[in-house]
Amino acid sequence: MGSTRFPNKTMKLVSAGIPMIEAVLLRLSQSKKVDQVILATSTELNNQPLVDYVDKLGYDVFQGSERNVLDRYYQAALQYNPDAVVRITGDCPLIDPNIVDAAVRMYEENDVDYVSNTNPPTYPDGLDVEVFSFSALKIAWIEAKTEYDREHVTPFIRNVEKFKTENMINSADC
């Protein structure tokens, strides 16, 4: 909610007349490969309307650090104990559950730590998905030292010298 370029963007109404975050959560709920959808947001007071809204919708909410998003994800994962984490940002109301499922399948079928469709990006903006193991997240949480790595969650995990990664490539570069 604290975006400097577009404040409160996740609570802005989208074409369906619902807040953007609700559209994202509804679409993610259509995934056949995602067992649980959790909003991981910060403890900043300006996020309370978002937290209350998502809680009222019946989704789990985890609150953590505003700046250290890697820590927020790690602490959420500790609480919910997933085998893998699927990361979708809250400003992607057109996220396609079929693309999410394809990324999870790629993760499950290959012996990898990290799968995404963003390295290089061949899908349209707004369809970004990342899937990574809890163990890779834990290593990143322990070893990542730069502010950039801690603020952006996955740059450390995308290190191909340390982790096995795969990129999901769209058949037509959009």
Describe each model-derived feature in a short phrase.
Residues 75, 80, 92, 96-122:
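Conserved donor-nucleotide/metal-binding helix-loop-beta segment in metal-dependent transferases, i.e.
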Residues 55-67:
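Conserved donor nucleotide-binding strand/loop of the catalytic core
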Residues 85-86:
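Short aromatic/hydrophobic "clamp" motif used to bind/position activated sugar donors
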Residues 5, 94, 131:
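Short aromatic/basic micro-patch
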Residues 132-174:
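Active-site oxyanion/phosphate-handling segment shared across diverse enzymes
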Residues 68-75:
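Glycine-rich, basic loop-to-helix element that forms the pyrophosphate-binding segment
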